[in-house]
From Swiss-Prot:
Ranges per topology, Extracellular: 1-45, 103-117, 181-205, 271-291
Family matches, as InterPro entries: CCR1-9-like (IPR050119), Chemokine_CXCR2 (IPR000057), Chemokine_CXCR_1/2 (IPR000174), GPCR_Rhodpsn (IPR000276), GPCR_Rhodpsn_7TM (IPR017452)
GO BP, one annotated term: immune response
Originating gene: CXCR2
Official protein name in the record: C-X-C chemokine receptor type 2
Entry keywords, A to Z: Cell membrane, Chemotaxis, Disulfide bond, G-protein coupled receptor, Glycoprotein, Membrane, Phosphoprotein, Receptor, Transducer, Transmembrane, Transmembrane helix
One family name in Pfam for this protein: 7tm_1
Glycosylation-annotated residues: 19
Cytoplasmic topological domain residue ranges: 73-81, 140-160, 229-248, 313-353
Membrane spanning residue stretches: 46-72, 82-102, 118-139, 161-180, 206-228, 249-270, 292-312
Family from the record: Belongs to the G-protein coupled receptor 1 family.
Chief place of localization: membrane
GO cellular component labels: external side of plasma membrane
């Protein structure tokens, strides 16, 4: 057939592509319904399983330690620490789903529709809550350093309300996954877990992808760029060396988040534009998108275990807090404790909770 002159709709008019949806979690294509025969359905599945297993172990251990250190230090807990506590909780909840995703890479989705919805929801909530919490941290740092404001963020009930609101908004943004994900069975391939919106799939895809990505990624990203831009300018102008050093942890956390999730978001945007025919779809482009989705998804999954490593290597206060816990329980000598062991990851904050 002539790939240049005919559209895919004309070439495959007799086929039903209403359920042909590219999931962020499981097989990006189903050979019996896809307009192109994929060159490669997925990255080597056993390689992916090994990565998932390592991320699961590192995330489980690392985020548990982060939560332990923050929860143990009630007196010196800063506003930023509360946000980081919720960030660790989100990563930990997602990590608990990784064994299920790993098994599905080998055997297909054998866990039914209920678990399909639950683990997909946890992944989306982890993504949205992560960037929303980072946006809140950027606002907190902006108020504390640029405006020297303490009154807005030092009240405990307000910080708790903000965190609860972030979880609620993240659930709302992830609601399409909860509503439309299900186990899909197709001939010649293993069962899969992905969105199924029936005959309205094409009509809803743009709305259900672009809106959550806009409000759950682009808007918080713009907030962070604004806040950290002015924060950095203030730090350099005032030569606030100590606070500048304390901000290294937060900047590292934000940078790692963007490096892990921005590529996936861009590829998902390209996939959405292609599926809604804003960008012409060809077999070559389809295969490139498939491979990019697989690769960038793995990069995003890696993020759930990286924050504790940042705290361990860059966050001096986290190391001090962990050593303090070990000393209290007699695992190390108290003489090895540093003089300043306040367990706040980022130094002074705009308030304490």
């Amino acid at each position: 057939f002539n790939m240049e002159s005919d559209s895919f709709e004309d070439l495959w008019k007799g086929e039903d592509f209403s359920n042909y949806s590219y999931s962020s979690d499981l097989p990006p294509s189903l050979p019996d319904v896809a307009p192109c025969r994929p060159e490669s359905l997925e990255i080597n599945k056993y390689f992916v399983v090994i990565i998932y297993a390592l991320v699961f172990l590192l995330s489980l251990l690392g985020n548990s330690l982060v939560m332990l250190v923050i929860l143990y230090s009630r007196v010196g807990r800063s506003v930023t620490d509360v946000y980081l506590l919720n960030l660790a909780l989100a990563d930990l909840l997602f990590a608990l789903t990784l064994p299920i995703w790993a098994a599905s890479k080998v055997n297909g989705w054998i866990f039914g529709t209920f678990l399909c919805k639950v683990v997909s929801l946890l992944k989306e909530v982890n993504f949205y809550s992560g960037i929303l919490l980072l946006a809140c941290i950027s606002v907190d740092r902006y108020l504390a350093i640029v405006h020297a404001t303490r009154t807005l963020t030092q009240k405990r009930y307000l910080v708790k309300f903000i965190c609860l609101s972030i979880w609620g908004l993240s659930l709302l943004l992830a609601l399409p996954v909860l509503l439309f994900r299900r186990t899909v069975y197709s001939s010649n391939v293993s069962p899969a877990c992905y969105e199924d919106m029936g005959n309205n799939t094409a009509n809803w895809r743009m709305l259900l992808r672009i809106l959550p990505q806009s409000f759950g990624f682009i808007v918080p990203l713009l907030i962070m760029l604004f806040c950290y831009g002015f924060t950095l300018r203030t730090l350099f102008k005032a030569h606030m060396g100590q606070k500048h050093r304390a901000m290294r942890v937060i900047f590292a956390v934000v940078l790692i988040f963007l490096l892990c999730w921005l590529p996936y978001s861009l590829v998902l945007l390209a996939d959405t534009l292609m599926r809604t025919q804003v960008i012409q779809e060809t077999c070559e482009r389809r295969n490139h998108i498939d491979r990019a989705l697989d690769a960038t998804e793995i990069l995003g999954i890696l993020h759930s275990c990286l924050n504790p490593l940042i705290y361990a290597f860059i966050g001096q206060k986290f190391r001090h807090g962990l050593l303090k816990i070990l000393a209290i329980h007699g695992l190390i000598s108290k003489d090895s404790l540093p003089k300043d062991s306040r367990p706040s990851f980022v130094g002074s904050s705009s308030g304490h909770t």
